[in-house]
């Protein structure tokens, strides 16, 4: 039986399952010693559903390289800092050989990604992506409350429900406010409805409580300037929170996706739509934005709040990509427990030439 290093893989579900194999040794593929190893037949069993999404192309001109597509489409699967890309074909071929239930021709020939080769799936995925654009246009310029074309709400509901994470009672979150005047702990929550401007998640006049998962992220989100005074509020969940997690959809590992309850091919069909929702929520508010720009995400967040009954959404911070934000609909479930007064001592900017359009 052959083995490879467990940490070649990024998918948290593979890492979790692989922890039961405690035999350290040398990985012949990454040329590293004293690393935790995992047997190749086990990897074949775990990865079978992923590689079953590929088939041999009818002609070389129509096909794609398996390794290239896996790395591009599933960036949450393999860690290229642990293994050279040029070694991956040999590793995957030996996984196929050791497992004995996969088509080794996928390595040596050009392949097609079957969900995209299926015309019905192409039409479905294309329709979902174009529906986002149609939804945006209709909400902005035609109908605000009653749409002329309905989305596939049953499928969207199923996908969003599978992305729910329970944030346990006692969890800590943070919010920063800029002010030269004293802000009391009782004032650190969401703004009053008469002062609530439109946000990515909330409509004008309907405030949500925007929190960050760590202090650094909320500092970035506040966009405080040098020497400005910041009030940092620490919030605690008074009860469990059911949050739809939309952060880093594109980096979900394929085994992790199945562990969440998705059929892998079905997830592929909805992936673009979920990524679009995630990306739109993550975009920072800009001065040039119109309130109209936020209508599609507001509409879907209201669906998550009012129809599905969840407590909020979580999404990646555009201001601090290593952190994430939460829009809490039911703010009575969290409480500000502490406020610190801070001063900005340093601000750094990174700029690049603007691309011509």
Would you name each region that the model predicts?
Residues 206-211:
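A short, exposed loop/beta-hairpin motif centered on an aromatic-Gly-Thr core
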Residues 215-226:
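Short active-site loop/helix that positions an aromatic residue
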Residues 1-170, 175-202, 225-357:
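Active-site and NAD+-binding cores of ADP-ribose-processing enzymes
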